[in-house]
Amino acid sequence: MPVVVTGSIATDHLMTFPGLFTEQFVEGQMENVSLSFLVDDLVQHRGGAGANMAYGLGLLGLSPVLVGAVGSDFADYQAWLSRHGVDTGSVHWSELKHTARFVCTTDQANNQIASFYSGAMAEASQIELAPVVGRVGAPDLVVVGPNDPTAMVRHTQECRDRGFAFAADPSQQLAWAAGDMIMELVSGAEVLFTNEYESALLLQKTGWTADEVLDRVGCWVTTRAADGVLVRRAGEEPLEVIAVPETKPVEPTGGGDALRAGFIAGRMWGLSLERATQLGSAVATAAVEVIGTQEYDLPRESFLARFGEAFGAEAADEVAAHLPG
């Protein structure tokens, strides 16, 4: 039975300005700003949390089913995902809007001017999981990733109504969501994913204690960047897993999505919480060593060698039994 990944699908358009934005500002004219920058570089990357997680799961051989909304400009991106083992047959295509897009220009001082166009993502709320299940069968897990807020609530409720196990990954949507909505997204999740900041925000907005969160979820996975991962379950001692050392850290964006993919793959393979978290940590490190959230690969031999260096030969053997390639 498949893993269904719901969440955002987007493209990132990143530009570099060979100067300083502040040099373009005119004193006394800040109420009438009209700025234009001649950039010397443009890079386009495939992204979106849902697509990033699906990509990682595809590399790990799980053939995930991606569910989200895109525009008519999605064809090349779709082909890329399909080549990497992702089932895109349940993606909703908008007839009116383009795929969600992040556009960012960075100057020499690392100042940024950015815009986000949600585009077709707003139509994700129209997607029902029942037709997806009718096409691919009942899922082992539904990941409810950051997306159009109405879509996230709808997918979560449908999982409860139909008895599907789901993972809650509210991510950046926690910043604006009210406490009641966060409670709805989290309660009953098999797995809750957050980073440290999101953990604090969740507790603040819901008024729950950490123990009260644990009473409502199967396990709570908190990423802590270079400090590794913390996994908690009600009534058990916390599990801490190190971050696999980076040899050439380049870009942290997408590391969290890659970790989620590795963790979910490990659990779907029947690995222990510890081993699945270690797998997630290793995949995350591979992701942050390249620019672009879907530019990393997992060559079997080198990946297992590195995994073994971090976690031991026995752990590597367990993962090797499932790793494709």
Language-model features: where?
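Conserved phosphate/ATP/ADP-binding segment of small-molecule kinases
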Residues: 160-165, 171-241, 248
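Conserved phosphate-binding/catalytic region of the ribokinase-like
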Residues: 207-325
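Glycine-rich phosphate/adenosyl-contacting loop at the front of the ribokinase-like
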Residues: 1-65, 76, 314-325
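A glycine-rich beta-to-alpha transition motif near the start of alpha/beta enzyme domains, typified by
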Residues: 63-89
